[in-house]
Amino acid sequence: MYPESTTGSPARLSLRQTGSPGMIYSTRYGSPKRQLQFYRNLGKSGLRVSCLGLGTWVTFGGQITDEMAEQLMTLAYDNGINLFDTAEVYAAGKAEVVLGNIIKKKGWRRSSLVITTKIFWGGKAETERGLSRKHIIEGLKASLERLQLEYVDVVFANRPDPNTPMEETVRAMTHVINQGMAMYWGTSRWSSMEIMEAYSVARQFNLTPPICEQAEYHMFQREKVEVQLPELFHKIGVGAMTWSPLACGIVSGKYDSGIPPYSRASLKGYQWLKDKILSEEGRRQQAKLKELQAIAERLGCTLPQLAIAWCLRNEGVSSVLLGASNADQLMENIGAIQVLPKLSSSIIHEIDSILGNKPYSKKDYRS
């Protein structure tokens, strides 16, 4: 799919300033020079997003200082990242406040940014959560106030709501778009059937269908993004924005000898992650990561870079959301772009053999 490096050293990124926000990436491998597709369409919409985005879950308004958050956003923006994702529930709304303050302080043109937020869990009251017309409209209004913005580019339904009729949710999403509070809407953690239902309702009543599903995707979770979402993309144009490329840090290799202090698994409220890492399955994953580490060394990159590049190599993925708690981590993650051209079919096959979890679609069984 991409040319392989002709040298043993890691591919070098050349950054050249252009009129557009941030920079354009191009990789050189002797000749001819070939430009990587750093910006991709979000699903079949016309919205152009950087293939890497910066997420704010756990970090903004929580794990890191506001100063560090500003440093990370600036670093991301200067390196061509235009997509910044948050949610009303992150740090009980504080993540949106921090994000909004940074955008205002930096004075970046709003038109150069793609800001996305998610609605479902708002306040403690019964009416302050879910996907009712009331909460979608009031929740997004409150989000925009915290962000100090007139609109977000994409508003996501943060999970399905079995207590609200699909037509009500789709009508409310269409309403906030028509009111100029959002440009597009998408889903997060919805099943293919639920997304298909939303699309059908939109078509039936001449409403706006969703353009994107936000899904967890990493080396140990593949089925949805590799089998289910491509079918939806071809049928109805829904794209994939993925999160947790390092499986909450598991794929980074930092947990290979236990739980280090200050890591996400050591935080209050993340006992589930700690249990996952220390489980039998967690130990098996760590053994596989040791084998993957050898491939990373051969390619001249780190394990996190290999894992992120592996997510990016999937053409059905519009953007991979990164989480970072310091500048070095973010720059390392952005460096995954350099690894992407080196993921030849033989390397991918080798990774699949180690993981042993490649999902198969119906058409694979037929062939």
Swiss-Prot record:
SUPFAM superfamilies in the cross-refs: NAD(P)-linked oxidoreductase
Higher taxonomy: Eukaryota, Metazoa, Chordata, Craniata, Vertebrata
Assembly, per entry: Homotetramer. Interaction with tetrameric potassium channel alpha subunits gives rise to a heterooctamer. Identified in potassium channel complexes containing KCNA1, KCNA2, KCNA4, KCNA5, KCNA6, KCNAB1, KCNAB2 and KCND3. Interacts (in unphosphorylated form) with MAPRE1. Forms a ternary complex with SQSTM1 and PRKCZ.
Assigned protein family: Belongs to the shaker potassium channel beta subunit family.
N6-acetyllysine sites (modified residues): K124
Compartments where located: Cytoplasm; Membrane; Cell membrane; Cell projection, Axon
PTMs per UniProt: Phosphorylated by PRKCZ; may be regulated by incorporation in a complex composed of PRKCZ and SQSTM1.
EC number: 1.1.1.-
Protein's UniProt name: Voltage-gated potassium channel subunit beta-2
Modified residues (Phosphoserine): S9, S14, S20, S31, S112
GO cellular component assignments: cytoplasmic side of plasma membrane; cytoskeleton; cytosol; juxtaparanode region of axon; membrane; pinceau fiber; plasma membrane; specific granule membrane
Catalytic reactions of this protein: hydroxyacetone + NADP(+) = methylglyoxal + NADPH + H(+); (E)-4-oxonon-2-en-1-ol + NADP(+) = (E)-4-oxonon-2-enal + NADPH + H(+)
Residue positions where Omega-N-methylarginine is found in the record: R28
Organism: Homo sapiens (Human)
